[in-house]
Curated annotation (Swiss-Prot):
Upper lineage: Bacteria, Pseudomonadati, Pseudomonadota, Alphaproteobacteria, Hyphomicrobiales
Assembly behavior: Part of the 30S ribosomal subunit. Contacts proteins S5 and S12.
Segment forming the signal sequence: none
Biological process annotations from GO: translation
Keyword RNA-binding applies: yes
UniProt function note: One of the primary rRNA binding proteins, it binds directly to 16S rRNA central domain where it helps coordinate assembly of the platform of the 30S subunit.
Keywords attached to this entry: Ribonucleoprotein, Ribosomal protein, RNA-binding, rRNA-binding
GO cellular component annotations of the record: ribonucleoprotein complex; ribosome
Primary gene name: rpsH
Protein name (Swiss-Prot/TrEMBL): Small ribosomal subunit protein uS8
Family statement: Belongs to the universal ribosomal protein uS8 family.
Amino acid sequence: MSVNDPLGDMLTRIRNAIGRKKTTVSTPASRLRARVLDVMKAEGYIRDYTQVDYDNGKSELEIQLKYLEGAPVIREIARVSKPGRRVYVSVKSIPHVANGLGIAILSTPKGVMADHEAREKNVGGEFLCQIF
């Protein structure tokens, strides 16, 4: 089956796995998905992820979800910029997610990064998703 929004598909898989209290979830691999997972890992929203390569040339990302005292660390995860409606933000208009308790993930000319890192580097970009 063809997926029109691979990043949105990954976020939905994570949201569904958290709803079912799963410890791991897998998704087809791509560089953008891996970069977003790098940011999520650095910010403490997931434990880790590994890339699993198969004999047929395809690979998947195995994501280990993080829970704190039985409650998921990720309370809310949402796609902002979608294929039908891209959302771009300048460095001055990068939002503070949940009054600074959450993060916004942006795709910038300097790579995929969290909102606070984009402010430090004084760069804007595509507002991919927000996590709280």
